[in-house]
């Protein structure tokens, strides 16, 4: 059965005229360092636990078709302290009981259907799709979703899709219909399959995407403006750089001109940020981000401090030492030479999960 899991109590989260592009610089009432506008009331990055929906069988609920659960199919020891779970079983949600006949994906393209494995005339396609759309609205406060691997309702990828022609081989490129419906209604929502979360890099990346999404929701609730969108990016730029230099550059281009388009650009920025953070942050990515942060600080460092930091970053790049060592060296330098811009970087809070 696995360790006990925290199941959350549901609680909600908290067309403009054309204007000149937002230019970063000194503004009355705002502290400024580098290219970051430091506003004292900027929403803080949420601390765990954060609300996350999850396939109910993964929490120990005996809701699978045969009356079993899948509690051991999740690395819960590393997740229980970070997430508050909202368990959902779409099959139970549409009125299928336990035990029940298993369901399967059949067909191709727009004709994809979900039917009973015992009776192909029992079609739950529309019911699962509608349930997904409804849950996307009901679960407005969630900041991520953990789906059951290869499930015809919940799988994100590699789900078996059977041909409606008897004897034809099945494909393994399907997506669960409930998951597809819900995620289409919640673009940007971090989602991952349970089995992939046993990979430490995937697990850490997912945790950070969830926390980032939660931070974004706070920003939206507080009111998205051009200045706040730029400040949000400024705080995440080195974390995004560590994960994907391509997405880092794309995000910068998106924010180069926000005239009267903050809401529209904000949606595109979130998609770019989530896609970028979904890329693995390798040693070279970390070393690149750390080197850029060193470049921001280097004029204040002594020759000895510079040598120590450069050597630590190079050991990170080559794998001779963990990323945390180089990060610690940079934090020591920041303690001796405080810098508001680097001190506001999300990278330092995120790297503990990577």
Residue ranges and their predicted role:
Residues 1-30:
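Compositionally biased, low-complexity flexible segments
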Residues 55-56, 89, 146-150:
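Short beta-strand segments
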Residues 59-67:
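Short N-terminal binding/cap micro-motifs at the start of the first secondary-structure element
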Residues 68-85:
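Short catalytic helix/loop segments, enriched in acidic residues and glycine
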Residues 87-111:
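Short, surface-exposed acidic-centric catalytic microdomains
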Residues 120-139:
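Glycine-rich anion/phosphate-binding loops
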Residues 137-219:
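Internal, conserved structured core segments that host functional sites
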Residues 190-354:
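Acidic, Ser/Pro/Thr-rich low-complexity regulatory regions
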